[in-house]
């Protein structure tokens, strides 16, 4: 809460800009190798070509145009985790559940072009976590159809749905959720 000379000015939060400079400074990577994608297709830094390839590995459209999860068998999961940091995605989802931000449309992902850092979700924009509406946060993230935004477009949850289709990751997620809530939250 911000008060200036005793007058209430509202609720503000300070946060760093989650851009390639931030990622380079905090993760020790070369900023010229950073790709940042938002809403599954929009390039904020670098290219989205690899992210689109990774998305198509887990979710494809059927004949009627609906998104369908392509299950990640053990072999496919091993390949998928060469590109996506599955443990980081689990931690991201746990944080989103704990800080129940109903605004899941503003998603960002990043990686380095040399894969020293695999695709990870960026946790930011948690302003709606202060609202009283909790909703079914994980239900939204595991919705293969997507979640409609205010402009009518769908925010795709492809990576999360693909990971959930794998038994090894699902077991890891549950175990990690219990551990994090017991020891950290």
Predicted regions and their residues:
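ATP-dependent phospho-/nucleotidyl transfer catalytic cores
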Residues: 13-101, 113-114, 142-154, 179
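Catalytic-loop signature of eukaryotic-like protein kinases
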Residues: 106-114
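C-terminal catalytic region of ATP-dependent kinase domains
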Residues: 115-185
